[in-house]
Regions:
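Short alpha-helical segments enriched in small residues
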Residues: 2-178
Length: 178
């Protein structure tokens, strides 16, 4: 009982930074519950995460009630041709930038007519690709009914680590916004 008491006290102290203590409280399920209970929908535009965010969320039963769809626009050409990102924007700021990820979030939200959207762009490595940003640099953008915003992170130089941490951080940012 002492362990349970200490656990409850600790969880109360760190509730803003800790999710998923119980099996039923995965961050994906918490997001799904918030979307469902508020009758909200979501869509994703994923670049270097390659659909991992979408895959994780649709693993929750009932996803069809809140998940409108996603697009994996890995290449610069795909971002321009399929998601409608302006080449001028990419030329001015780089494909890995705040401006591009926010445009991705807005465009996918419009494409799927969702209430919320989330987008990712970044350099997972091992090379920089079409960007001048350092390997490990990622941008995560969120569009809500009222605004769009983004965050920049650097998750190191391991490709698996960069994509994994980006998926987790995406869910964390989304949960806080909902």
């Amino acid at each position: 009982n002492k362990i349970n008491s200490y656990t409850a006290k600790l969880l109360a102290l760190i509730k803003d930074i800790f999710t998923g203590y119980e099996d039923d409280d995965s961050i994906e399920k918490l997001i799904a519950n918030k979307l469902t209970s508020n009758n909200l929908t979501i869509s994703f535009a994923e670049s270097f995460t390659g659909g991992k965010i979408s895959d994780s969320l649709v693993s929750v039963a009932g996803a069809s009630s809140f998940f409108k769809g996603s697009i994996v626009c890995y290449s610069t050409t795909s971002k321009v041709n399929n998601l409608g990102i302006k080449m001028d924007l990419i030329d001015k700021y780089s494909v890995v930038s705040k401006e591009v990820v926010e445009s991705m979030a807005l465009n996918v939200k419009k494409m799927f007519n969702s209430d919320y959207s989330l987008a990712t762009t970044g350099n997972a490595g091992p090379t920089k690709g079409d960007s001048n940003k350092e390997i490990g640099t990622v941008y995560i953008g969120v569009a809500t009914p009222e605004k769009v915003f983004s965050f920049e992170f650097n998750f190191g130089n391991s490709r698996e680590r960069v994509t994994g941490k980006s998926v987790n951080k995406s869910f964390e940012l989304l949960l806080k916004e909902l």
